[in-house]
């Protein structure tokens, strides 16, 4: 586990974005952990997120020409990632995002920021069903831009109704690689290193039941 991944977990726990206990998910499953990126709402959090997303993207090796953030949670992530790439990686890339409702005045339309062109990295917090990402892929196709990678905060590595996770299904159906800052393996490694064997074992049992790998 890289230092930025451990720091991401530490920040998420300190901000209560990552919690351990018993949480009933929308699926009805009772999970031993819960991740809510909406809790990362401080200026220091968004700066940290930008650095982590930028590092994950750079480490992935996928060449990109611009950053795109799907409305709404992806909007600050796109800006923060673009800032971190410029400040820490000497890569000054344009960014854009979409609105959920089109404007009929001012600049109009659903797209804001730089024109969609070249190889585009899409940044979002998590992928649940993949619906929002598919909408973005359609926008890129219309603009004749190429999706280079999708970067998310956490990959739960959890299957849906079938044997695949939403991320696996998305990668298989679109061919677009998904990069995550952390996944379930990193959380378990962090807990074991911290000496919290009990929580790590609960997550391992949950993964045995619902894991996608």
Curated annotation (Swiss-Prot):
Alphabetically ordered keywords of this record: Glycosyltransferase, Magnesium, Pyrimidine biosynthesis, Transferase
Keyword hit for Magnesium: yes
CDD domains: PRTases_typeI
GO cellular component, one term: cytoplasm
Catalytic activity reported: orotidine 5'-phosphate + diphosphate = orotate + 5-phospho-alpha-D-ribose 1-diphosphate
InterPro entries: OPRT, Or_phspho_trans_dom, PRibTrfase_dom, PRTase-like
EC number from the UniProt entry: 2.4.2.10
Residues bound to orotate: 34-35, 128, 156
GO biological process: 'de novo' pyrimidine nucleobase biosynthetic process; 'de novo' UMP biosynthetic process; pyrimidine ribonucleoside biosynthetic process
Cofactor annotation: Mg(2+)
SUPFAM superfamilies xref list: PRTase-like
Positions contributing to 5-phospho-alpha-D-ribose 1-diphosphate binding: 26, 72-73, 99-100, 103, 105, 124-132
GO molecular function per UniProt: magnesium ion binding; orotate phosphoribosyltransferase activity
TM regions (residue ranges): none
Subunit-level organization: Homodimer.
Physiological role: Catalyzes the transfer of a ribosyl phosphate group from 5-phosphoribose 1-diphosphate to orotate, leading to the formation of orotidine monophosphate (OMP).
HAMAP family: PyrE
Family membership: Belongs to the purine/pyrimidine phosphoribosyltransferase family. PyrE subfamily.
Protein name: Orotate phosphoribosyltransferase
Taxonomic source organism: Teredinibacter turnerae (strain ATCC 39867 / T7901)
Biological classification of the source: Bacteria, Pseudomonadati, Pseudomonadota, Gammaproteobacteria, Cellvibrionales
Gene: pyrE
């Amino acid at each position: 586990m890289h230092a930025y991944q451990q720091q991401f977990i530490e920040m998420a726990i300190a901000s209560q974005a990552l919690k351990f206990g018993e949480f009933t998910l929308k699926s009805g499953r009772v999970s031993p952990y819960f991740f809510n990126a909406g809790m990362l709402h401080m200026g220091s959090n968004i700066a940290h997120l930008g650095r982590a997303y930028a590092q994950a993207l750079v480490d992935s090796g996928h060449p990109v020409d611009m950053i795109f953030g799907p409305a709404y949670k992806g909007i600050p992530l796109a800006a923060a990632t673009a800032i971190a790439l410029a400040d820490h990686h000497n890569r000054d890339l344009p960014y854009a995002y979409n609105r959920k409702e089109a404007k009929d005045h001012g600049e109009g339309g659903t797209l804001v920021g730089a024109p969609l062109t070249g190889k585009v990295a899409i940044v979002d917090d998590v992928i649940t069903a993949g619906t929002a990402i598919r909408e973005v892929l359609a926008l890129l196709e219309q603009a004749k831009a190429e999706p280079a990678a999708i970067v998310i905060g956490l990959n739960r590595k959890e299957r849906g109704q079938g044997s695949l996770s939403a991320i696996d299904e998305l990668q298989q159906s679109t061919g677009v690689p998904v990069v995550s800052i952390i996944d379930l393996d990193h959380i378990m490694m962090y807990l074991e290193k911290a000496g919290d064997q009990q929580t790590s074992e609960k997550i391992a049992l949950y993964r045995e039941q619902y894991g996608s790998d």
